């Protein structure tokens, strides 16, 4: 059994029939369908659960609705993404706290800092304001966090080192940093969300490939960030067909296989460990049945 620790199935990309990525004997293939069909396929391929992070006040409402439509399969988290925080009113922060207190919410996220895009200085200040507020909320509610940190590790680590919320644990979502950065998050006790970034060509993935061997297996979760971060598959699928194609949890076996290769361990051991890690970190109400020998 595999759990997708980070997907956005409430995204508009899944609200009408769509083209999506799956796997076949050649590696990858495209299919046409809708979200209900995709969720049936995930159930059939033993990828029954996913964690659905909020990224804005509107999406927090949407993830709670989606979780109510798929009880016991979709687990909601509440948060404001750093790049969305500049569009939210600070006076509306009480709405976020109200969402976070809803039954079934398992974490605060995704939250953090993102300096990838050029921003005015006041935008970074607003990111910091929301980040610390949401860490405070996580600490108050005793919930782990899902962290989004891009091109901002120095500032994020400085905040995380002094904030008590680090004691509750969390995951660095979509990690693709170097060994040196991984070591700093390891010292703070965080987990690492590994997804499509590990399935890119070497020139793009070499830092992450170098970091994976030093990250203990008990600190790794697998994720997709669907519908985003497609694996490299232009060698088997025409690039023009990949336009507007959605990523899905169906690629997770490939992520697990690559982690196993880089760590020199069995695929089964990675699958079992990452599933257990996800269940334990987020206290998921999921029963894990060991694979038959």
Kindly give the residue locations of the regions a language model identified.
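Mid-domain alpha/beta scaffold segments of enzyme catalytic cores
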Residues: 1-293
């Amino acid at each position: 059994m595999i759990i997708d620790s980070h997907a956005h199935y409430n995204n508009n990309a899944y609200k009408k029939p769509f083209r999506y990525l799956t796997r076949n004997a050649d590696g990858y293939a495209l299919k046409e369908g809708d979200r209900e069909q995709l969720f049936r396929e995930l159930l059939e391929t033993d990828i029954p659960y996913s964690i659905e992070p909020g990224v804005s006040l509107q999406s927090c409402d949407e993830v709670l609705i989606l979780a109510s439509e798929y009880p016991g399969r979709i687990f909601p988290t509440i948060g404001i993404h750093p790049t969305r925080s500049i569009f939210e009113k600070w006076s509306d922060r009480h709405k976020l706290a109200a969402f976070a207190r809803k039954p079934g919410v398992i974490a605060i996220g995704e939250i953090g800092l993102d300096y990838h895009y050029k921003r005015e200085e006041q935008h970074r200040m607003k990111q910091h304001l929301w980040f610390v507020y949401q860490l405070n909320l996580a600490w108050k509610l005793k919930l782990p966090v899902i962290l989004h940190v891009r091109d901002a590790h120095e500032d994020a680590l400085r905040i995380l080192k002094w904030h008590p919320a680090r004691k509750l644990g969390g995951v660095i979502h979509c990690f693709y940093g170097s060994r040196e950065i991984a070591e700093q998050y390891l010292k703070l006790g965080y987990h690492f969300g590994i997804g499509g970034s590990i399935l890119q060509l070497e020139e793009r993935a070499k830092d992450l490939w170098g970091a994976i061997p030093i990250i203990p297996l008990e600190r790794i979760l697998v994720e997709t960030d669907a519908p985003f971060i497609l694996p490299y598959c232009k060698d088997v699928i025409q690039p023009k067909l990949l336009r507007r194609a959605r990523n899905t949890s169906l690629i997770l076996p490939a992520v697990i296989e690559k982690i196993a290769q880089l760590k020199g361990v069995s695929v089964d051991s990675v699958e079992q460990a990452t599933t257990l890690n996800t269940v334990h970190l987020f206290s998921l109400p999921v029963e894990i049945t060991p694979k038959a020998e």
